[in-house]
Amino acid sequence: MSESTKIRDIAQALGVSIGTVDRALHDRRGVNPLTKSRVLQMAKTMGYQPNPAARFLSSKRRVRISVNLPAQIASFWDTVREGIDEEARTFAAFGIDVELHTFPRMGFGEQEAFDAALESKVNGIIIATGRPQDLRGSILKASRARIPVVSVVTDAPGTARLAVVSIDSPASGALAGELLSRLLQGQGKVAVVTGDLAITDHAEKYNSFRASVNAFSPSVQVMEPIQNHEDETEAYETCRTLLRAHPDLNGLYISTANSAPVLQALADVGRLNDHLTVITTDLFPALIPHIESGAVVATLYQRPKSQGQLALRMLNEFLVGGRCPSHQLRLAPHVIMKSNLSFFLDRISMESEMEESNAFAATPKLRKESS
């Protein structure tokens, strides 16, 4: 039967009122059992599918969603926020208020932001957490209060979160490991610059990178990871310390978006474009010249905008439509090199133009605040 069957179609087929059909379908009082049975059977015969979004609109109920994301690294997290902003426009009519809150960086201030969201009695929360074990109790409290929590970018394993949307971190690390192994032809010393191994995403990338290098090139030495805690100054200083201690370094994998200060450190000590194979993460304007010059042989694009869009879409569908999402949605990373850089630049530019053209199509209740 037609998927567009409406309540009025069932009412016409049975010769009863629309109100009677509505009460029968939604198990409300005022319908005798025989009529209710006839309505349910006709709905099944005609292939009726309930429209939870329409029911939500008719209820005139509003939903508040708190989005808690770090301020640093801005080039990455601002793009995640762009995706959330764009997705919010697509369901502006549903009466959903999206509140954006920021905390300094991963692992710093996220507990306070989460607790503030709970106290304000929001209906759903999107988080990026660097200390999932510290938030376990708060996420459980949210779950018991029927406030769904969706993790974005990095997971919060072992918690009561509803779902996670992230890049496939093990795949990213494994790709970087295979690329470096092949480019170094099975010899040399490589280092990994990351944020914090307490963060699920960072730990998964490092572990899979090391396993991949060991599988493809057992003779390549993988050094202990350099953690900079997503701080630009620390990233610069720790990289310079690394290069002073290991002037014979052959390869470098920067596993987070915090690559600008690392590349600056390489340039300042004369190692950029100097027999050092560098693989980075993500794509932003300052990185483009380094890819074009060959100083960066490849970058692994984490699709931050898509992650933001999908996280909000998943939470919205659960709150409005009652659809339980997959517990884990992992996106495939994109490998960007000099030869295909223009394709991704054109694509990102096109997406930005489309977003600007649609900016006035709808005006969602989206508030930006800092915690």
Where are the language model's segments positioned?
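Amphipathic helical "hinge" segments at domain boundaries
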Residues: 50-112
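Hinge/cleft segment of the Venus flytrap/periplasmic-binding protein
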Residues: 213, 303-371
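Hinge/beta->alpha junction and helix N-cap segments in small-molecule ligand-binding domains
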Residues: 70-78, 99-110, 131, 165-175, ...
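An alpha-beta-alpha
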Residues: 176-217, 224, 315, 323, ...
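Short helix-capping segments at alpha-helix termini
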Residues: 90-94, 145, 213-220, 245, ...
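Flexible loop/hinge segments that line or gate small-molecule binding clefts
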Residues: 131-171, 284-292
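Hydrophobic alpha-helical
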Residues: 125, 129-143, 209, 227-286
